């Protein structure tokens, strides 16, 4: 039995990241409530000015530009009042612009290109009782997901790479599996109206192979980006084939809507290079007001 249709358009424009999403969702009832969602997604991220927003210079970011176009089709149903199981199929193209020769560049003469055309099924079981999607103050969330990706990796070197390093165009088929678990909880400290706490854990395992070069292989690895600011820069050290991470988020409450959220995040990652550190840390503080 048909229940409802919903259509939407999302547009986000920013100096580092821009995105467009056109889609819809159909809810219906057979033996239980079911839904189908469908969307076209375009994302552009420009990390060529990779230190955007930093108050001081840093050395752990790299210049990179990323474009993605893909179609998504999902089918799911509720498991409980607050949880759902979703099967999804994504297919599209990712384009990575970067330089094999230098971490920071501005001239297109140094810009190498890797294109990945792919199709990727995904399954996910998610549960959430969070009071807000961004900067939640109470509740728990849990996500268990697994993916398979099959695609073609195509590398086009820049004029500099062709002239000085004698690199050539290349194509190859690639495939891999991956699994991720993410859990977070937020709660009020008993007996204290001024202080609350959040903590979380995340673990990822993949079988990503070596692609056309080490730089783009790392770009395609899962990233640990627990804060909003960490999502606006490209930091290779926080990408890994396999990793585990934990977080603690003390919160100082001035009112129900106004609070200071702090966070300490630690990531234990598989080494990509012998010189890589296994432990990585992020410290964050955000002054939050919810309207």
Q: Where in this protein do the model-derived segments appear?
A:
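Small/polar glycine-rich anion-binding or flexible loop at a beta-alpha turn
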Residues: 265-267, 277-283
């Amino acid at each position: 039995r048909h229940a409802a249709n919903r259509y939407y358009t999302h547009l986000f424009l920013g100096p580092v990241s821009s995105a467009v999403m056109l889609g819809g969702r159909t809810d219906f009832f057979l033996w239980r409530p079911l839904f189908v969602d469908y969307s076209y997604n375009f994302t552009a991220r420009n990390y060529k000015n990779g230190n955007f927003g930093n108050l001081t210079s840093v050395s752990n970011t790299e210049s990179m530009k990323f474009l993605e176009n893909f179609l998504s089709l999902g089918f799911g149903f509720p498991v409980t009042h607050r949880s759902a199981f979703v099967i999804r199929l994504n297919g599209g193209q990712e384009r990575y612009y970067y330089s094999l020769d230098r971490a920071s560049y501005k001239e297109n003469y140094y810009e190498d290109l890797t294109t990945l055309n792919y199709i990727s099924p995904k399954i996910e079981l998610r549960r959430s009782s969070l009071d807000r999607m961004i900067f939640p103050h109470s509740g728990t969330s849990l996500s268990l997901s697994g993916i398979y990706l099959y695609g073609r990796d195509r590398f086009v070197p820049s004029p500099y790479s062709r002239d000085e390093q004698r690199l050539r165009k290349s194509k190859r088929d690639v495939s891999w599996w991956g699994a991720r678990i993410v859990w977070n909880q937020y709660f009020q400290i008993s007996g204290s109206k001024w202080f609350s706490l959040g903590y979380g854990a995340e673990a990822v395992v993949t079988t990503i192979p070596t692609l056309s070069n080490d730089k783009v292989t790392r770009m395609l690895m899962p990233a640990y980006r627990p804060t909003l600011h960490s999502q606006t820069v490209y930091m290779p050290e926080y990408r890994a084939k396999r990793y585990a991470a934990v977080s603690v988020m003390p919160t100082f409450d001035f009112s129900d809507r106004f609070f200071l959220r702090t966070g300490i995040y630690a990531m234990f990652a598989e080494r990509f290079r012998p010189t890589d550190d296994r432990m990585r840390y992020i410290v964050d503080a955000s002054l939050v007001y919810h309207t």
